[in-house]
Regions:
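Short, flexible loop/hinge motifs at secondary-structure junctions
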Residues: 1-152, 196, 225
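Catalytic center-proximal scaffold of phosphoryl-transfer enzymes
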Residues: 18, 132-134, 139-463
């Protein structure tokens, strides 16, 4: 009888142990997941650098013997002497240290030093005085014609309107601060309505210019696309960009994925070239485009797996970096060895699948839980051509950094202003920001060109 009780007790304890083992495994999985989340930073995930906080390590040189600061071959910007200065102030000694008068002695040219400064800000008021002349022949009174754009008794000129657009769009300064700045510098304080009206007018004039930018991008062999969240009226919207080395296009949409990418505002729905992006799944629904994946994003994801001691991730990371290095030195060597390179790529993926744990049942309905490493491996396998494209074609870049750089200023604007007050204001910013970004890529003076926009002059691009 006692034996039976002990057997029942033993079976009960075994059941408790099995249950606890399952709980422990569940907790260990949760701890691992939370630890991975805490260890995420901009070097091993898609997290932006701003999320690293004060614990971010300094950017020391990655290679031994490397140096910080400006690298060899870096173009400097030393301040140079002007051969024809605006003002020259003579510095002539009148009395010698011994007390003798030397004011009438011959001068010997000595050292010259220059101070480069800006003129003292001053408001300029131009009055257009109309005069009327009566014809002695027919008696008609002929009136002098005001210049185009001079429509009110008192109004702000083109330079002020240009500066307000530039400060708000390109330099991300809020409307109230623009008014304060102009007040401090020039003693004029345009109200919020005037400043926003300048943006709206510039936006309207630039419609055909934006159309030209879109056509240039659509006809390019390689384009970059990306998107980032922005606030419009307090709600999440998405700022999408498609760009090239010479042109930038932005548009605002309420959605991030397919609805936005195939919208009438988008220029990549029928894009036939090579589209570089961050492997966001919606982009692969664009069947007319060939794709290229951002190597920088892949390296960060691989870094996360390397942190978990995954041998396959180390091999894949080294392979991608070696292909990049070889493409810069002699891409023909990569092209010659293409079959071997693709075979090595396949071997790393095959070995990686053996190293990764198989999908685990999570206790919930639906698909089995897969490791992040396995998900990454299958993405690398599925999009092999897009991952390796840069290694065999010199016009295909390794990263999507171009699109990310184009979006970065708008993220700064969100940090400064937090939200766009209206969808109209967001659309104004998108078009104006795309225009100024295009000008800067082509080394065209932004201030002068916006003045030309307001003056009704034709806008021409360098390329």
């Amino acid at each position: 009888m006692r034996v039976k009780e002990l057997e029942e007790e033993n079976a009960s304890l075994r059941a408790v142990i099995i249950l606890k083992d399952a709980k422990i495994a569940q907790f260990e999985s949760k701890v691992k997941e939370l630890t991975e989340r805490l260890n995420k930073n901009s070097s091993n995930s898609h997290e932006p650098p701003s999320s690293d906080g004060y614990g971010k390590k300094p950017a020391f040189p990655k290679s031994k013997g490397g140096k910080q600061g400006g690298q060899d071959g870096h173009k400097g910007g030393t301040l140079l002497m002007e051969s024809n200065p605006d003002v020259t102030q003579p510095l002539i000694p009148l009395v010698c240290d011994c007390g003798h008068d030397i004011s009438n002695e011959p001068l010997i040219v000595g050292e010259q030093r220059q101070v480069h400064d800006i003129p003292r800000p001053k408001k300029e008021v131009v009055a257009f005085q109309q005069y009327n002349v009566q014809c002695p022949c027919c008696g008609k009174v002929n009136k002098g014609q005001f210049p185009a754009g001079v429509n009110s008794a008192v109004q702000y000129g083109t330079r002020i309107r240009t500066l307000s657009v530039l400060l708000n769009t390109d330099y991300k300064i809020p409307v109230k601060k623009i008014s304060s700045l102009l007040g401090d510098l020039y003693g004029i304080t345009p109200n919020e309505g005037s400043i926003m009206s300048n943006n709206r007018r510039c936006y309207e004039i630039l419609e055909p210019v934006e159309h030209r930018i879109k056509e240039e991008i659509k006809s390019s062999a390689v384009a970059h696309s990306d998107e980032t969240g922005v606030r419009v009226e307090g709600k999440l919207h998405w700022l999408h960009t498609t760009s090239t080395l010479m042109y930038t296009y932005f548009y605002i949409h309420a959605k991030r994925g397919s609805d936005a990418i195939t919208d009438a505002c988008s220029i990549i729905a029928d894009y036939p070239g090579r589209l570089i992006h961050d492997c966001y799944e919606s982009y692969f629904k664009l069947t007319k485009a060939k794709h290229g994946l951002c190597g920088a994003h892949l390296l960060r994801e691989l870094a996360s797996q390397i942190d978990d001691k995954k041998a396959w991730a180390q091999l894949m990371s080294e392979m991608l970096l070696e292909l990049l290095k070889q493409a810069k030195i002699d891409i023909n060597q990569n092209i010659k060895n293409r079959v071997f390179i693709e075979k090595q790529y396949d071997i790393i993926i095959s070995d990686g699948k053996k190293e990764e744990p198989p999908p685990q049942k999570s206790g919930k309905r639906g698909k089995y839980k897969r490791s992040k490493g396995l998900n990454l491996l299958e993405r690398l396998e599925k999009h092999k051509e897009s991952v390796l494209a840069h290694a065999f074609d010199p016009i295909i870049p390794f990263t999507n950094n171009l699109a990310e750089r184009d979006l970065r200023p708008s993220k700064i604007k969100m940090k400064v202003s937090n939200t766009f007050r209206s969808i109209e204001g967001a659309n104004h910013h998108a078009r104006l920001a795309g225009f100024t970004s295009t000008l800067r890529k082509q080394n065209i003076n932004v201030f002068s060109t916006i003045m030309d926009v307001f003056d009704g002059k034709e806008i021409t691009f360098a390329q």
